[in-house]
Amino acid sequence: MSDNSQKKVIVGMSGGVDSSVSAYLLKEQGYQVVGLFMKNWEEDDDTEYCSASADLADAQAVCDKLGIELHTINFAAEYWDNVFEHFLSEYKAGRTPNPDILCNKEIKFKAFLEYAAEDLGADYIATGHYVRRRDIDGKSQLLRGVDNNKDQSYFLYTLSHQQIAQSLFPVGEMEKPEVRKIAEKLDLATAKKKDSTGICFIGERKFTDFLSRYLPAKPGPIVTVDGETIGEHQGLMYHTLGQRKGLGIGGTKEGSEDPWYVVDKDVANNILIVAQGHEHPRLMSVGLIAQQLHWVAREPITEAFRCTVKTRYRQADIPCTVTPLDEDKIEVRFDYPVAAVTPGQSAVFYQDEVCLGGGIIETRIQE
């Protein structure tokens, strides 16, 4: 076994069970382990939305129990400039961004990685992500986590092989119940804490309430694919393709009780377009165009190849053919039609267990 005692690892302690167990596992492997708690969001009200102080207290309790020190760092300014402003501008343009992917790219594996290496003298950083790393021919590949239910490689496709080489993912080799069991055995403060859901800076609060603070709502008509106005939306930004809940419309006068789904957004005219049935042709795509490409451990593609793709987190892999259009744009053709392919979201590509990389969905291709 290699001697890790000279290697210093800074663990991103979120106050959750995964990072807690990651710190423990690394300590068991002999590394010098130090915790770092990142504050990425400044609350502007006194409500209970943000649990940052509770998370910090949990992280501190875990570090005390494990006998490691905990540093704190405030990245709120970097987060606002590099993640949140982009998030707002995408919503304004009628797209649906994924801020967690940008947060990993700009904060956790950039600002945090740089701070850990330069200010804290780290050899590695570690996080509680459910992914694995494999080193081949001097390059680090990103692999799916062993726990298929929890695999988070979708959120990390923007990392370079250099960033992956400086990162450790201790729980990536484990199933989630196993991780909880370790935390319970050690009696860690986070052992029974539920997994955080939703976007990091919104927490558990209602998305529409949060967004309306930053972007003025602009109501407009809800129109069927046949051109009939059947309701009013409170703002296109509150809706995403494939959405069913929160439309406030019942069956049609013809009597069909099939639920309504958002099938398109006409941003120029502020119209929300809906249809009945989750397999309506307007909801289905046969492919997509992606841009802002990033390949983890391979050169940019020059010819078509076969792989699988996910167009959203926790979706089953879709077999597809990827064809380069130019240096930063590809066409992806699915083997079968796929519902709710959403511009602004990420398309992430896989070859078996290896995450190849991905890009931002620019447009969807329909029959």
Curated annotation (Swiss-Prot):
Q: Any one cellular component term from GO for this entry? A: cytoplasm
Could you cite one Gene Ontology molecular function of this protein?
tRNA-uridine 2-sulfurtransferase activity
The positions annotated as site (Interaction with tRNA) read 129, 345
Name the positions where ATP binds. Answer: 12-19, 38, 128
InterPro entries for the chain: MnmA-like, MnmA-like_C, MnmA-like_central, MnmA-like_central_sf, Rossmann-like_a/b/a_fold
UniProt entry tagged with the keyword RNA-binding: yes
Gene Ontology biological process terms in this record: tRNA wobble position uridine thiolation
Q: Give the annotated active site.
A: 103 (nucleophile), 200 (cysteine persulfide intermediate)
- Region (Interaction with target base in tRNA) residue ranges read 98-100
Which UniProt keywords are given for this protein, alphabetically ordered?
ATP-binding, Cytoplasm, Disulfide bond, Nucleotide-binding, RNA-binding, Transferase, tRNA processing, tRNA-binding
Top-level enzyme category: transferase
Q: Which parts of this chain are annotated as the region Interaction with tRNA?
A: 150-152, 312-313
Where does the protein end up?
Cytoplasm
Pfam families the UniProt entry points to:
tRNA_Me_trans, tRNA_Me_trans_C, tRNA_Me_trans_M
At the top level, the lineage of the source is Bacteria
Q: Which reaction does it catalyse?
A: S-sulfanyl-L-cysteinyl-[protein] + uridine(34) in tRNA + AH2 + ATP = 2-thiouridine(34) in tRNA + L-cysteinyl-[protein] + A + AMP + diphosphate + H(+)
Give disulfide pairs as residue numbers. 103-200
Look up keyword Oxidoreductase and say if it applies.
no
Query: Per the UniProt record, which EC number(s) apply here?
Result: 2.8.1.13
Subunit-level organization: Interacts with TusE.
Q: Which family does it belong to?
A: Belongs to the MnmA/TRMU family.
Summary of the function given for this chain in its UniProt record: Catalyzes the 2-thiolation of uridine at the wobble position (U34) of tRNA(Lys), tRNA(Glu) and tRNA(Gln), leading to the formation of s(2)U34, the first step of tRNA-mnm(5)s(2)U34 synthesis. Sulfur is provided by IscS, via a sulfur-relay system. Binds ATP and its substrate tRNAs.
The protein's name is tRNA-specific 2-thiouridylase MnmA
Organism of origin is Proteus mirabilis (strain HI4320)
Q: Which gene encodes it?
A: mnmA
